Amino acid sequence: MYVLGIESTAHTIGVGIVNERAEVLANEMHTYVPKEGGIHPREAARHHAEWGPRLVKRALEVAGLRPEDLDAVAYSAGPGLGPCLRTGAVMARALAAFYEKPLVPVNHSLAHIEIARAVTGFSKPVAIYVSGGSTIISAPAIKRYRVYGETLDIGLGNLLDTFAREVGIGPPFVKGGVHVVELCSEGAEEPADLPYTVQGVDLSFSGLLTAALRAWKKEDKKKVCYGLWETAYDMVVEVGERALAHSKLKEVVLVGGVAGSKRLQRKVALMSEERGVSFKPIPYELARDNGAMIAWTGLLYYKHGFTVAPEEAFVRQRWRLDEVEVPWL
C-alpha cells in the first residue's frame, strides 16, 4: 500500500510517500522565506503552487512509483493559513480526481504525533508539540487525543523567530540546524533573568518575549539569548513533566519544528531519565512540517475507511487536536 501526502499549512510545501510499514519512500519539501517580516499567506500560497507540482514529480521519482501505483492521496486540511491550506487541497483534489484515487483529509497536529509514534514504536506517549504556531502537550485517550496543556498566546517557534527578527539576528532563523537565538547565546556564562510563566499545564510566552526585547537594549546580548531559550525550554519541559504525572504514561515524544533543537532534546531526555520514562528523538526531517507525516496519517485513516470525495474536500484554518476523531486509538 502506498499513500502520497501533501503538507501546506504554513511556510513549507512538502510531498511524502509512505507504505503500510511506515517506511518513508520519499519526503521532498521546499520552504518559503519572506524577504522581510513574517509569513505573508498569499505569497506563501503562490510559492506552494509553484513548487508543489515539482515536488510531487520528484517524490514519485524518488519512490520509484507512478501515480497509478498510489492507493490514496492525503493532504493537510488544517489547522493553518487559509491560502496555503487551499493550495495544498487543490493539488490533492486534482491528483485524486485525475487518477481516481481516494482522498483523505488529515489534521496537521495529529500527523506530527502519529509519525513520531511510528518512528519510535511508542504506543501511548505524552506528545510535546512545539512549532511556530503551536505549543501543545497531549496524550492518547479514547478515540482521540487529550490536550493536557497548551500555550495561552504564541507558539514557542513564534517566540524565537519574532525575537530574532525584532533584534536583527534573523532571518534566516535556523543555521546548520540550530536556531539563531541559540547561536547568539554561545559564549555566555549565565542566562539573563527573564520571566517564567507556567499556569498548571498551560504556559505563556508573550511576557517572556516582551521582557527579552527590553533586556536586549540594556543587557549583555549573549546572556539575553541564553536566557530566552533556557527559560522557554524549561517551561515546555515542566508542563511536559506535569502531563506525564497526570497521565501516568511512560513514554514521551518531542515533535514540531522546534523539536530539532538539540538543547531542548537534552532537557527532555534528562527529565525523562529522572522520571524513569522512555524518550526517543526523531529525525528532524520528520519532526518538522513534512509530507511524509501527512501520508502516514492519511494511510491510517484510509485503512479505517475515512475518505472524502474530491468535491467534498475541506480545509479548516482552526482545527483543535482534541476535536479530531482517531479511530485507531
Curated annotation (Swiss-Prot):
Name of this protein: tRNA N6-adenosine threonylcarbamoyltransferase
InterPro entries: ATPase_NBD (IPR043129), Gcp-like_dom (IPR000905), KAE1/TsaD (IPR017861), Kae1_archaea_euk (IPR034680)
Cofactors required: Fe(2+)
Location(s), subcellular: Cytoplasm
GO MF assignments: iron ion binding; N(6)-L-threonylcarbamoyladenine synthase activity
Residues annotated for Fe cation binding in this entry: H108, H112, Y129, D289
Xref: Gene3D superfamilies: 3.30.420.40
Stored NCBIfam families: arch_KAE1, gcp_kae1
Entry function: Required for the formation of a threonylcarbamoyl group on adenosine at position 37 (t(6)A37) in tRNAs that read codons beginning with adenine. Is probably involved in the transfer of the threonylcarbamoyl moiety of threonylcarbamoyl-AMP (TC-AMP) to the N6 group of A37.
Principal subcellular localisation of the protein: cytoplasm
Gene it is expressed from: kae1
Metal-binding listed as a keyword: yes
Keyword Cytoplasm: yes
UniProt keyword list: Acyltransferase, Cytoplasm, Iron, Metal-binding, Transferase, tRNA processing
Family, per entry: Belongs to the KAE1 / TsaD family.
Cofactor note: Binds 1 Fe(2+) ion per subunit.
GO CC, one annotated term: EKC/KEOPS complex
Binding site for substrate: Y129, V130, S131, G132, G133, D161, E182, S261
SUPFAM superfamilies registered for this protein in UniProt: Actin-like ATPase domain
Protein's organism: Ignicoccus hospitalis (strain KIN4/I / DSM 18386 / JCM 14125)
Gene Ontology BP, a term: tRNA threonylcarbamoyladenosine modification
Enzyme Commission designation: 2.3.1.234
Reaction(s) this enzyme catalyzes, per UniProt: L-threonylcarbamoyladenylate + adenosine(37) in tRNA = N(6)-L-threonylcarbamoyladenosine(37) in tRNA + AMP + H(+)
Covalent S-S links between cysteines: none
